[in-house]
């Protein structure tokens, strides 16, 4: 074990994307690193945006590249890292990483371990071989949660309730995501599309172009806005990339939105882009507690969202959509634009008090301390 006044935490995460799980892991690691008596490191399965940002923050990163290493070699690499660095707690994110981290931990030092569940699985395997592999990993993941890892963190109360049907109730702990408000505000800047058309109404969606994000529904809702409020100068923005891009571009043409819709792809200035929107739409089929929503609230950007997951706790009731269809979203957007909202300052203050990265890190640290039986630092 480490010295009594020093806590070492190893996080294990894929890093193949820069999405919600990666964003929250980065925010948590960065915040934990600033706490006295805490040392953090990350084992990441892919080089990418996450590893780049972690290194810039000063977090020690070990890459076990899954493109070149099989599961056995990754487990071996994790075991070697654990024996060398000797963490007090192992914290994993996402299904495959939960399994690999659990096995390596058992083979190494068998220290307390836990996972964060960031939301429901978004992976939809195709083909018999892929489906079989997905099912096997899912069963292993469930076994590890029930018999190897001590705690399961849920990022919203609603997600925590759903997880009670899957995991032992005593293992589930709700720790809501945290956002670095100052860091978000520091990234504000001028978005070119707003500078070009300052008089237009800019509505956008941020996320990977995958089925669960329902960008198709966003586009159909935008067609409804164009139909119901034709005198407005509308501009619609899709930020993100993914396998559905060609299909969504074809749908844009079918809906007659080619002049109004811009597919921006992945943007490094996404915070500045969000800050330039009049409305951000979040119409996923399901969510945990999206970092994008927390960032938008921090920026004072109005959000219209599906009434699911942690969104119901941070989006005003009249901007939540229960009718998960195009008309439901277009109606909510028009209502928001016509009536306006004076809730921005109040919502930002609530985020500062309840969803700050510092509060998230402190609550997570308390859980680590509980797992290893330490209460003073």
Where are the regions a protein language model picked out?
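N-terminal strand-loop element at the rim of the active site
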Residues: 7, 11-76, 162, 174, ...
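A conserved mid-protein helix/loop that constitutes part of the nucleotide-sugar donor-binding site
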Residues: 19-30, 201, 205-226, 243-249
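Short hydrophobic beta-strand element within catalytic cores of glycosyltransferases
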Residues: 43, 302-305
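Short His-centered aromatic/hydrophobic patch
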Residues: 92-98, 117
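Membrane-proximal helix-turn-helix segments that form the acceptor-binding/catalytic region
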Residues: 133-152, 166
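Carbohydrate-associated surface elements
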Residues: 158, 178
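Aromatic "clamp/platform" in nucleotide-sugar-dependent glycosyltransferases that forms part
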Residues: 266, 285
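Conserved acidic donor-binding segment of nucleotide-sugar-dependent glycosyltransferases
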Residues: 317-327, 335-341
